[in-house]
């Protein structure tokens, strides 16, 4: 399983997202390294399909799913609709994505 967190420098939510993701992985018994990727320019944002900071991907898939909005990639904060703290992916979203990825690896 490949786990990545993409972020812009000085993102206030990046450290918390990584910490929560580590806790989810630990609780699920998955000893995997989290690759943290700093996105520092617009070209990189476009190449990485970066939808804002922080973005969590597992096996290359955005845990928030694919957006129905027109694609716009930029150096910006990310908003997670329905989250208690809108700048962080909900823990439940992380748990679901980790479980789904693990299930896909065992089938």
Please annotate each region the language model reported.
Residues 1-23, 27-28:
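Local sequence-structure signature of Cys/Sec-based thiol-disulfide redox active-site neighborhoods
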Residues 31-42:
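Thiol-based oxidoreductase modules, predominantly thioredoxin-like and allied folds used
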Residues 61-102:
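Non-catalytic, surface beta->alpha helical segment in thiol-disulfide oxidoreductase systems
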Residues 43-49:
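Acidic pyrophosphate-coordinating catalytic loop
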Residues 1-2, 31, 100-101:
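Extracytoplasmic thiol/disulfide redox context detector
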Residues 49-57, 69, 73-74:
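Structural micro-motif
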Residues 105-107:
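Short acidic DE-rich linear segments
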Residues 5, 9, 44, 82:
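Conserved short-loop catalytic and cofactor-binding motifs
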């Amino acid at each position: 399983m490949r786990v990545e967190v993409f972020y812009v420098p000085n993102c206030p939510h990046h450290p918390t997202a990584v910490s929560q993701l580590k806790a989810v992985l630990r609780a699920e018994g998955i000893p995997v390294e989290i690759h943290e990727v700093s996105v520092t320019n617009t070209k990189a944002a476009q190449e990485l399909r970066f939808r804002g900071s922080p973005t969590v991907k597992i096996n290359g898939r955005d845990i928030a799913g694919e957006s129905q909005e027109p694609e716009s990639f930029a150096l910006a904060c990310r908003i997670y609709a329905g989250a208690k703290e809108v700048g962080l992916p909900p823990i439940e979203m992380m748990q679901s994505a980790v479980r789904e990825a693990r299930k896909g690896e065992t089938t």
